Each structure stands twice: as structure tokens, then as C-alpha cells.
Amino acid sequence: MGPRALLLLLSGVLILTETRAGSHSLRYFSTAVSRPGLGEPRYLEVGYVDDTQFVQFDSDAPNPRMEPRARWVEQEGPEYWDRNTRNAKGNAQSFRVNLNTLRGYYNQSEAGSHTLQWMSGCDVGPDGALRRGFMQYGYDGRDYLALNEDLRSWTAGETEAQITKRKWEAAGYAEVQRNYLEGECVEWLRRYLENGKDTLLRADPPKAHVTHHPISGREVTLRCWALGFYPEEISLTWQHDGEDQTQDMELVETRPSGDGTFQKWAALVVPSGDEQRYTCRVQHEGLQEPLTLRWEPPQPSFLTMGIIVGLVLLVVTGAVVAGVVICMKKRSGEKGGNYIQASSSDSAQGSDVSLTVPKV
């Protein structure tokens, strides 16, 4: 399984909760996948500030270390990277032990591959104060155990998780997590936001347009595109004569563009000929005001119009020239054959002159 597949696993059972405008989040995601007969489980850990990945650890790397994934975190000193590498390696070992323990809880054989996922993080409001902390575990794609919003108790997702819940309650593990989330997590988030403010606090507005896709003679699909925006949160809504059509439209998940920005589209099937009655409303914090877009039928380009005008002139000119030639031939015939054929050296000049429209 490649790094991309492992990263996709991170967003499977562990649900990403949206941050509101003006708020920010620090999140760490970890995944361990057992692979019987192929050695130790693979462990991957990534860190995000808002929608931006800034660190990554991969146990399968030639020299496994916590590595930067954003320029603004590269300024951290060697002690930072050594400490986070030690923490990641310790987490990897804990995950390997936990995979074996959970396999026993579920009475599973050693032959199958299993996945353990973990997410931990904090959200702060515009004032920088903690708004919410969270920690979740997932096993084989299902919720296993989660810290409640009070940061003092746990919710078990499955019967087998009750065993872990009792252990953690006895050990006071909720208090340990609460102290981290209310203290260290918030402090590091503030530091990252300050160091990476040029990137993390920016608001890139979307570039939006509508495309037209005929389905049949009676229906077409209108697709509203929003490209190149940051942060991730955006709203696309189709309207018919001003009324929202959210129930009927197809809306894809926001996707990374690969350059630090995001993209999204919303589509709606409409009757052919009624396209101008439908508008797409785009809302994003990078916009001073929402955009309202319609599908614009393609207009003939300047080049196309020039070609058309040129062809018309050519046809008209050709007709005039043909008329002049016929007239001259008739006159020559009337004068008894005084027409003299031009030499080959004169014929090129004659052709240029003949393209001139004669005065009348």
C-alpha cells in the first residue's frame, strides 16, 4: 500500500470537522497497517494546520524521521525534529502492540491485514482560545473509541472497545489528553500560525465559471466550477429564478489542486433552452461579495469574425472581377479582336491589378 492510499485511510473513519471562519485547527493523523509475512506494520503520521500538511513520518522510509512538508516549519531547529522523530517512533511501536491487542479482542487470526487509525487535535477561535479538543480511534474502518467534548469521558463505538474504555478510565488517560489539548496543542498551533501566517492566513478567491454539457435534445447539465481557492471551505449553490436547488444538484467533495489550493464543482440538470434562468452562487472568504454566475453561450471570436468578413469580401470581389472580365471580353469582340495577350512576365502584375475593385 502506497503513501497516497494510507493518506486516504486517514480520512475514512476519522471524520474531519470543519473549522468556522476565523478559527484554526491543529490535527495529527496516524495509521498503522499490519502486513502478515511482510514484516512489521507500516506506520504513517501526518500533521495539519487547517488545510495545510506541514509534517510527515513514514516508517518505510530509508531513514525514518519526522520531515517538513511546508516551508514555514523548516525554520524549526534540530531539537524539534529529533524530539518529534522520537515521538513518532514511539507511536509506531505503540500502534504495533495495539494491533496485536485488538486482534485478540476481536478474536481474529494472524493471517489477515488490519488497520488502526488515530486522530488528535484542537480548534481555536478568532481570539486564540481553545474552542474544542478531540481524540478518536478507529479499527478496520469503524469507530472504536473517542474522547467526548467535555474532554473528561469516553464513548465506545463497539462492544470490544469497552475493554479499552475501562482501562483508560482507570489510568486517568482522559486527564492526560485534556492537559495536552488545552495547553501544548493550543500553544503550538499559535506558534505555527505566526510562523506560517503568509501561507496559513491567506485567502485566495476562487476562479469560477459555468460549463454546458448537452445530455439529450431536452436536457443539459450545467456545471459550476470553483478553482484555485484557499482555505478549503466554500459554498456552491445552484438557483432557479432565485430559489435554491440544493436537493437536485450534484455536489462533489472539495479536492486539493496539488498546488496548495482547492477545487470544487456543483452540477444541475436543466431543461434545454432554460439555461439563463439558472444561476450559480459562489461564497468564499476570499471574495468581497458572493459571485453570481450564468452559463454564457459562446460568442464568435474576433478571429472567426475576421475570417467570415474576409470570405465575404473575397466572394464579392471575385464577382466584381468576373463581371469586369466578361465586360472587357465583350468589348474586345465588338472591336474586332484588338485584345493582346499579356506576356508571362506581365501576368503576375496583371493579377495584382485585377484584384482592385474598379471605380464606377
From Swiss-Prot:
GO terms for biological process: antigen processing and presentation of endogenous peptide antigen via MHC class I via ER pathway, TAP-independent; antigen processing and presentation of endogenous peptide antigen via MHC class Ib; immune response; positive regulation of T cell mediated cytotoxicity. Residues 296-308 are annotated as: Connecting peptide. Residues 22-111 are annotated as: Alpha-1. It is found in: Membrane. Residues 112-203 are annotated as: Alpha-2. It holds the Pfam family MHC_I. Residues 204-295 are annotated as: Alpha-3. Residues 341-354 have a biased composition (Low complexity). Residues 1-21 form the signal peptide. One of its GO terms (cellular component) is lumenal side of endoplasmic reticulum membrane. Residues 22-308 are extracellular. Keywords: Disulfide bond, Glycoprotein, Immunity, Membrane, MHC I, Phosphoprotein, Signal, Transmembrane, Transmembrane helix. Disulfide bonds join 122-185, 224-280. InterPro entries: Ig-like_dom, Ig-like_dom_sf, Ig-like_fold, Ig/MHC_CS, Ig_C1-set, MHC_class-I_related, MHC_I-like_Ag-recog, MHC_I-like_Ag-recog_sf. Residues 329-360 are cytoplasmic. Glycans are attached at residue 107. It is a single-pass type I membrane protein. Residues 206-292 form the Ig-like C1-type domain. CDD domains: IgC1_MHC_I_alpha3. Involved in the presentation of foreign antigens to the immune system. Belongs to the MHC class I family. This is BOLA class I histocompatibility antigen, alpha chain BL3-6. It comes from Bos taurus.
